[in-house]
């Protein structure tokens, strides 16, 4: 692997990857950037209210242009990957995985969400594998996520990826997932 002096340098941003889903479809994984506002807005419009709530723990409640813009313009501590599919010759965002590092750069909070029509095909797993790889490459030592305790799909994906879970002591409706990245 390439040594990178700054974990957020341009050299740390990959061009893209391809991923084959369980059903044989191909997706393109790439970093999200400011030019993706319309893809992100369309993606948000396909999420159910429950999906928005799971993904953003209730912080984003709509698919407005402002919400899409906020999700495509990052500060240097944030990184996000999109899963892009070709549907009838058009690019369609079908999933997103992102993280935000702590102030000291040793930990990051992560999240993943997948278009309901593309769930249970492997999109979330592929996105998270690449997100975990990028976090390791950038020297992050621990990744964590907080999600609704009722989110069964998230629990299964987290276990598959090697995360350990524990109930959130301050909120019984939430669970915290943690993954050590320095092994």
Enumerate the language-model features and the residues they cover.
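Long, contiguous binding/interaction regions
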Residues: 1-183
